[in-house]
């Protein structure tokens, strides 16, 4: 028996030894050529499995080599790699983390069942982002062992995951037997019904109560509880009735449905009168003299303790200094605290006061902000890093915020919104209104959330979440395919090619990606609608994108609270996004949830045109006539017919015929489940017609995009009054393609009616 050693040389620095054993050499085999069973490597020559031991427990940085300062690979986030077995239903997304570091930076390879992973080895391909291997919509063929191998010249380590894909069974939801249970309660008690739902597909759960109809044998039902944006399945499995009365007695039903079918189970609630108290109960309820003394002493101690806490907080907040007083401000940069606006709508009720606030600042103005301990942050905990955006009156900075988690300090990245030195009284009030809106609305995954405010010892700061990928419009343009007609016209849209950022993940957008973007924005808008908030400035430029591609609705500078009524009428001449506005908003200055739905339709068009400019070639003074004639935006290149029908529904002239945001969320949820992960191939087709415009339109688009980049502070500035009743849709104004166009005032209604009559006669 003879042994032959075959040496395979690495393109870098690794030598791999393989042994070939031949038991008996025959004469006929003397000229046979032997070769290594290792396939020809397509990457640096460590496509084989490592032979140095798995070293899976290397969790800290090993010692450096004294001569070269190098380090062998080591795990940096071992705690996030502890789960080895992943059992997932078919269709789910699976992520395998391989967080590793070393000096030099180790190269990472992935193996499936001892074979190297190539990007297109599976349907939908593999994705690798931030040291994570991603398998979207897994199927049964994805089962197996996945091993991450990290190697540099000082050594190698590896880590193995096991994936088990389970076949989905198509069935309607299953409700746990015996739930909900029948209940009996006295008047004034609280009652809780529970219902356990099992469903492979995402279930939609509702709680119903039957209403006896004496005129009809079949009972009617009223919906007591339905799933919202922030509710989870666990929340929906519980129904709580507070302070029950006789009228609430009856049958309660837990209803669960999915795409396969519907299941339901019911329980009865009996409400009983409160029994009269017995003699023993009355005797026990009479406190004796000792108990009275104890109660009084406890009350005094509680009051003293509360006073001590207030004094400590008072001293801590002002550091021993006098509290802020109402002062006159000669320099706007030194604005002291200002009064919290409890009712923002009051700002628009007094016309004279509003006109006074809109005038340029000629005299010092006064503010007093009350301290809100729930939201107040210390300025010394915030470090401004770099300017992200700047408008005429405001600016946004990227910053580091130090927070205290128990006894440990942590640093997080945030954004800080503030005014510039040339602000006036109205600008400060606008920023205060935005702050109050964000406080009132609360937190949601798909809106930019308020982290805190700085109102003491300096100018007003709003500290908000940071979105690493910028706004959705710029993200879509950065991710347009390279070397297509779509990208060749970008410079004419007002963008500098030298400023283009690289594609963040190097992956071409798929249909599922852009449908997901639309679905996430719709969820955020549904949440705002539930909070009685109309945004008034929905556009791709006002949707921010995080590092994890989470869509977040931003820029509440134009948002308004409509809790007191269902609409908001604008009386001032502030700039508004004309090409995104509904017909009734253009003509009557009335904004409702239905006008936000229209704007969302234009935003959908932006998404599925990869950030195209709406209504190319149409001047602002021609837009009303264009829309009144029944014309709408054409179907964007990358939208399906069903998606375009959804856009057209949003653009119904009659606001009552437009869908609400809950319906939009449900439709987009279904489209997302049916969408494909196939990558778009023919991006060049149709781009020339969609993005190329005449030279005049290109100039208009350039001006529009430059204005789009400004923040809300510039958009809300006041413009000069109309001269002699001239309508703003004149030829001189048409040369300015500013997407924020001043609305018409009520005193121009006669001129507007004449203009509408002229447009109808021309049509």
Swiss-Prot record:
It is a single-pass membrane protein. One of its GO terms (biological process) is positive regulation of cell population proliferation. One of its GO terms (molecular function) is ATP binding. Disulfide bonds join 98-148, 195-254. GO terms for cellular component: plasma membrane; receptor complex. Residues 28-291 are extracellular. Its EC number is 2.7.10.1. Residues 691-711 have a biased composition (Acidic residues). Its main location: membrane. The modification Phosphotyrosine is found at residue 568. Residues 73-164, 173-270 form the Ig-like C2-type domain. ATP binds at residues 388-396, 417. Residues 1-27 form the signal peptide. The keyword Metal-binding does not apply. InterPro entries: FGF_rcpt_fam, Ig-like_dom, Ig-like_dom_sf, Ig-like_fold, Ig_I-set, Ig_sub, Ig_sub2, Kinase-like_dom_sf. The active site is at residue 537. It is found in: Membrane. PANTHER family: FIBROBLAST GROWTH FACTOR RECEPTOR HOMOLOG 1-RELATED, TYROSINE-PROTEIN KINASE RECEPTOR. This is Fibroblast growth factor receptor. It comes from Halocynthia roretzi.
């Amino acid at each position: 028996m003879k042994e032959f050693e075959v040496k395979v040389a690495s393109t870098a620095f690794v030598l791999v030894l393989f042994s070939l054993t031949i038991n008996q050499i025959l004469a006929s085999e003397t000229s046979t050529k032997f070769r290594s069973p290792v396939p020809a490597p397509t990457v640096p020559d460590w496509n084989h499995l490592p032979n140095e031991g798995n070293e899976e427990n290397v969790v800290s940085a090993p010692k450096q080599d004294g001569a070269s300062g190098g380090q062998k690979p080591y795990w940096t986030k071992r705690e996030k790699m502890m789960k080895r077995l992943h059992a997932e239903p078919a269709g789910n997304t699976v992520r395998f983390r391989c967080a590793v570091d070393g000096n030099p930076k180790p190269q990472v390879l992935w193996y499936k069942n001892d074979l190297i992973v190539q990007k297109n080895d599976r349907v939908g391909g593999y994705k690798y982002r931030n040291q994570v291997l991603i398998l979207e919509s897994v199927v049964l063929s994805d089962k197996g062992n996945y091993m991450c191998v990290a190697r540099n010249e000082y050594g190698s380590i590896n880590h193995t995951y096991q994936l088990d894909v389970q076949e989905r069974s198509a069935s309607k939801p299953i409700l746990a037997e015996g739930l909900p249970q029948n209940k009996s309660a006295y008047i004034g008690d609280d009652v809780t019904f529970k219902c356990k739902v099992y469903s492979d597909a995402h279930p939609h759960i509702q709680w119903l109560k039957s209403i006896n109809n004496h005129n009809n044998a079949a009972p009617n039902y009223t919906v007591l509880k339905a799933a919202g944006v922030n509710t989870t399945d666990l929340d929906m499995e519980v129904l709580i009735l507070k302070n029950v009365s006789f009228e609430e007695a009856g049958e309660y039903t837990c209803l669960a449905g999915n795409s396969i079918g519907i299941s339901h189970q019911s329980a009865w609630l009996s409400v009983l009168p409160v029994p009269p108290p017995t003699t023993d109960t009355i005797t026990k309820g009479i406190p004796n003299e000792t108990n009275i003394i104890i109660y009084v002493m406890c009350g005094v101690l509680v009051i003293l303790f509360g006073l001590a806490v207030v004094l400590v907080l008072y001293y801590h907040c002002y550091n021993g200094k006098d509290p802020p007083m109402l002062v006159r401000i000669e320099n706007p940069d030194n604005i002291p605290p200002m009064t919290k606006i409890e009712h923002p709508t009051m700002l628009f009720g007094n016309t004279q006061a509003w006109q006074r606030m809109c005038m340029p600042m000629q005299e010092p103005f006064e503010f007093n902000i009350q301290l809100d301990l729930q939201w107040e942050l210390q300025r010394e905990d915030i470090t401004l890093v770099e300017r992200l955006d700047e408008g005429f009156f405001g600016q946004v900075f990227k910053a580091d915020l130090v927070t205290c988690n128990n006894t440990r300090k942590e640093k997080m990245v945030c954004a800080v919104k503030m005014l510039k030195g040339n602000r006036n009284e109205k600008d400060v009030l606008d920023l205060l209104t935005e702050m109050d809106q964000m406080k009132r609305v609360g937190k949601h995954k798909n809106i930019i959330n308020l982290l805190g405010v700085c109102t003491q010892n300096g100018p007003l700061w709003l500290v908000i979440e940071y979105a690493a990928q910028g706004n959705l419009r710029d993200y879509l343009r950065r991710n347009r395919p390279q070397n297509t007609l779509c990208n060749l016209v970008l410079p004419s849209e007002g963008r500098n090619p030298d400023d283009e950022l690289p594609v963040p993940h190097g992956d071409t957008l798929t249909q599922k990606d852009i449908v997901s973007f639309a679905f996430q924005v719709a969820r955020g808008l549904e949440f705002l609608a539930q909070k009685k908030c109309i945004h008034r400035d929905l556009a791709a430029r006002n949707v921010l994108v995080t590092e994890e591609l989470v869509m977040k609705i931003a820029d509440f500078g134009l948002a308004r609270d409509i809790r007191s009524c269902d609409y908001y009428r604008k009386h001032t001449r502030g700039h508004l996004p004309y090409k995104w506005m509904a017909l009734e908003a253009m003509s009557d200055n009335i904004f409702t949830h239905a006008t936000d739905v229209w704007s969302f339709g234009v935003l959908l068009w932006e998404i599925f045109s990869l950030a195209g400019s709406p209504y190319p070639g149409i001047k602002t003074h021609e837009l009303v006539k264009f829309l009144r004639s029944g014309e709408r935006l054409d179907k964007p290149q990358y939208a399906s017919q069903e998606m375009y029908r959804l856009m057209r529904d949003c653009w119904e002239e009659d606001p009552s015929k437009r869908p609400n945001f809950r319906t939009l969320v449900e439709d987009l949820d279904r489209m997302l489940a049916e969408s494909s992960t196939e990558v778009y191939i023919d991006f060049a087709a149709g781009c020339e017609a969609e993005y190329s415009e005449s030279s005049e339109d290109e100039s208009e688009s350039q001006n529009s995009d430059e204005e789009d980049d400004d923040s809300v502070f510039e958009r809300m500035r006041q413009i000069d009054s109309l001269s002699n009743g001239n309508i703003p849709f004149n030829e001189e104004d048409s040369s300015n393609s500013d997407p924020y166009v001043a609305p018409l005032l009520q005193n121009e209604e006669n001129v507007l009616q004449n203009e509408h009559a002229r447009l109808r006669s021309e049509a």
